[in-house]
């Protein structure tokens, strides 16, 4: 009897301990949850209202655009501050500071790419309207950080640090990281170069690159249907842009309303405005252009002194020294030599390669998202895109006045007479870019006779161009399937277009 009482007492203690542990875990995870009701004191010029719908999407209504973007920064930080901080750390090469030596290689590569330096430089080159928008967003993020010290999400507690203030340059870092993800082709260039050096050149060019096995290939889709094919007689647009898979998503659903703007859709995390979505007059979506924006150059360089050859002369590379902090250890110093083509990024088998990247070019890195958000028609849409200088995208457009359109835009290198899909000879100086491709020389279509537009990462360069075309374009099977489905019938509704987005048939 005594033993059974002891066992019962032990069981009760175990249950109590388990309940207490679960309660502690629940409190630990959910204690920093966003405040979604009540009033908050903030530095805005007039009251701002933030409501959330049944899907928890924030709807912001403000008296000024600055106040609206301040609120966007605040609600984004409420839900995604850890993600934002990781994004800027990955891009800026600062993961080792919180994760230790395991992240050192990632940080070293990011420092070689100079993402942090590029972001700082570009922050000073922004047009006043774009800088003001990014500053308002950053103020909102920082208001959340400042009013929640020691009450941030559990990830910060586990890692044992507090987030530093958000800067304009951090929003640019987030965009640069997306650019890096979408345009990193240097490994492919190296692989193809190795095959060409050891195999049949004609066969390599025919077959490379090859995707082996049944692995899914990531790809984005966007399409527009003119009114002649819809039940309403008005255009319809659908889009599902894909970035790297992750939880949470790199997209943040939001609705922003202020004088001169009423826009809803998905913001790219860490950036103000709506990247893809619609306002009262137009709708738009994007897919990756897949144009090659990186080139590797072979270099004859002394990696001890930084002296290298170019066009028969010996030049001095610029030393870039970075101090990388490592959690629990002394930091390390990383030295990168910067040639006229870019940083020495990789070396193998005694050969050093420099990396030239369109995102690192000195021209302003324009992010005219608010211009897109406020555009009322095709001309204003294209005018906003003409100053866009981020990663290459296919932009699909539809408007309430009955138009559909396509526009390519982004920072694309102007190569004349060479493609750049294998490492180029650096010392000879014969394979140099001549700037970036002008906006008016990029593919553009308004109201095609078919009444259909579809972009699925396929090659959009259907006409001769003065610059070489090179890229990791998708095979045309997805775009062909979309066009075949759209052309198979008429009187489409928005709900019915969803069946095309969910279609899984492969025409390969």
Predicted stretch roles:
Residues 1-19:
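N-terminal Sec-pathway targeting helices
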Residues 61, 68-70, 233-234, 245-249, ...:
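Short helix/loop capping segments that flank catalytic or ligand/cofactor-binding pockets
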Residues 182, 186, 347-367, 372:
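Conserved, charged catalytic cores of large soluble enzymes
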Residues 200, 262-263, 268-331, 370-374:
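Compact, glycine/acidic-enriched structural inserts
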Residues 214-216, 252-265, 271, 361-367, ...:
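A conserved hydrophobic secondary-structure block that centers on an alpha-helix together
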Residues 351, 390-489:
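Hydrophobic alpha-helical segments
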Residues 359-362, 366-395, 400-401, 468-508:
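Proteins synthesized as precursors that undergo proteolytic processing into mature forms
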């Amino acid at each position: 009897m005594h033993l059974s009482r002891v066992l019962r007492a032990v069981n009760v203690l175990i249950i109590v301990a388990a309940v207490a542990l679960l309660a502690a875990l629940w409190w630990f995870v959910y204690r920093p949850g966003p405040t979604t009701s009540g009033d908050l004191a903030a530095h805005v010029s007039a009251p701002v209202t933030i409501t959330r719908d049944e899907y928890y999407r924030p709807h912001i209504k403000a008296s000024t655009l600055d106040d609206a973007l301040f609120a966007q920064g605040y609600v984004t930080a409420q839900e995604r501050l850890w993600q934002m901080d990781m994004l800027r750390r990955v891009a800026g090469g600062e993961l080792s500071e919180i994760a230790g030596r395991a992240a050192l290689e990632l940080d070293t590569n990011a420092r070689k790419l100079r993402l942090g330096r590029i972001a700082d430089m570009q922050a000073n080159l922004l047009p006043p309207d774009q800088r003001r928008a990014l500053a308002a967003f950053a103020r909102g993020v920082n208001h959340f950080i400042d009013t929640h010290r020691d009450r941030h999400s559990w990830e910060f507690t586990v890692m044992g640090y507090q987030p530093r203030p958000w800067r304009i340059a951090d929003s640019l870092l987030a965009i640069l990281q997306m650019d890096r993800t979408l345009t990193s082709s240097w490994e492919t260039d190296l692989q193809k170069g190795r095959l060409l050096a050891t195999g049949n050149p004609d066969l390599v060019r025919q077959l490379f690159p090859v995707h082996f096995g049944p692995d899914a290939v990531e790809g984005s889709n966007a399409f527009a249907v003119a009114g002649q094919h819809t039940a309403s007689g008005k255009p319809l647009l659908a889009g599902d842009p894909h970035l790297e898979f992750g939880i949470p998503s790199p997209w943040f659903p939001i609705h922003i309303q202020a004088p001169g703007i009423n826009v809803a859709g998905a913001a790219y995390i860490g950036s103000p405005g709506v990247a893809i979505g619609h306002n009262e007059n137009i709708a738009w979506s994007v897919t990756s252009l897949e144009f090659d924006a990186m080139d590797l150059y072979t270099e004859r360089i002394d990696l001890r002194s930084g002296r290298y050859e170019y066009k028969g002369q010996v030049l001095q590379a610029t030393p870039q020294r970075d101090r990388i902090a490592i959690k629990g250890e002394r930091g390390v110093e990383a030295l990168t030599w910067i040639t006229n083509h870019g940083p020495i990024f990789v070396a193998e088998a005694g050969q050093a390669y420099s990396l030239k990247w369109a995102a690192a070019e000195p021209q302003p890195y324009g992010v005219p998202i608010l211009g897109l958000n406020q555009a009322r028609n095709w001309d204003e849409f294209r005018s906003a895109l003409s100053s866009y200088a981020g990663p290459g995208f296919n932009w699909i457009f539809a408007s309430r006045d009955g138009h559909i359109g396509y526009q390519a835009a982004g920072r694309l290198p102007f190569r004349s007479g060479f493609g750049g899909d294998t490492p180029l000879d650096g010392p000879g100086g014969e394979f140099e870019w001549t700037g970036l491709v002008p906006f008016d020389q990029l593919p553009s279509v308004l109201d095609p006779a078919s009444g259909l537009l579809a972009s699925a990462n396929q090659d959009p360069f259907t006409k001769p161009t003065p610059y070489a075309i090179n890229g990791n374009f998708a095979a045309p099977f997805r775009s062909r399937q979309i066009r075949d489905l759209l052309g198979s019938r008429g009187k489409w509704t928005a709900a019915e277009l969803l069946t095309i987005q969910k279609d899984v048939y492969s025409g390969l």
